[in-house]
């Protein structure tokens, strides 16, 4: 057992928000997270608003939290933000049993996930850097 890995430090032009213990499998959540990765935040919010996935509302709420963190805590321009990172991690797994025939039972696993969204301020292409 080595030393615990230090969390990644945010740069000055970044802000993040984390949603923990979401009741959805990491595989399903990653489908929605990959949909917004690398997009401007306005386009990502529009995609999440009209997505038919059940978890899209929670992902939208987390993205709005990251945008609010960027604006209020880091003084970043909301119009120049992109979704730099959107990654999913495994959380706990609830175990339940399902009654089967002939007196047997089988296990049902109900997975949970963590979601982390990092937004980054980028310079507009028309501006001088």
Swiss-Prot record:
CDD domains cross-referenced by the UniProt entry: Ribosomal_L22 (cd00336)
Pfam families given in the database record: Ribosomal_L22
Function: This protein binds specifically to 23S rRNA; its binding is stimulated by other ribosomal proteins, e.g. L4, L17, and L20. It is important during the early stages of 50S assembly. It makes multiple contacts with different domains of the 23S rRNA in the assembled 50S subunit and ribosome. The globular domain of the protein is located near the polypeptide exit tunnel on the outside of the subunit, while an extended beta-hairpin is found that lines the wall of the exit tunnel in the center of the 70S ribosome.
Source organism per UniProt: Brucella suis biovar 1 (strain 1330)
Gene Ontology biological-process entries: translation
GO MF term list: rRNA binding; structural constituent of ribosome
Subunit structure and binding partners: Part of the 50S ribosomal subunit.
Top-level taxon of the source organism: Bacteria
A cellular-component GO term for this protein: cytosolic large ribosomal subunit
Name the record gives this protein: Large ribosomal subunit protein uL22
Keywords assigned: Ribonucleoprotein, Ribosomal protein, RNA-binding, rRNA-binding
Family: Belongs to the universal ribosomal protein uL22 family.
């Amino acid at each position: 057992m080595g030393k615990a890995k230090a969390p990644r430090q945010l740069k000055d032009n970044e802000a993040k928000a984390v949603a923990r213990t979401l009741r959805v499998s990491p595989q399903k959540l990653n489908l929605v997270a990959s949909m917004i990765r690398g997009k401007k935040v306005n386009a990502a919010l529009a995609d999440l608003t009209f997505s038919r996935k059940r978890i899209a509302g929670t992902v939208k709420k987390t993205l709005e939290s990251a945008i609010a963190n960027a604006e209020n805590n880091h003084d970043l321009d909301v119009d120049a933000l992109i979704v730099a990172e959107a990654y999913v991690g495994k959380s706990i797994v609830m175990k339940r049993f399902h009654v089967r025939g002939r007196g047997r039972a089988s296990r049902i696993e109900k997975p949970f996930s963590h979601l982390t969204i990092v937004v980054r301020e980028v310079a507009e292409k028309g501006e001088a850097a």
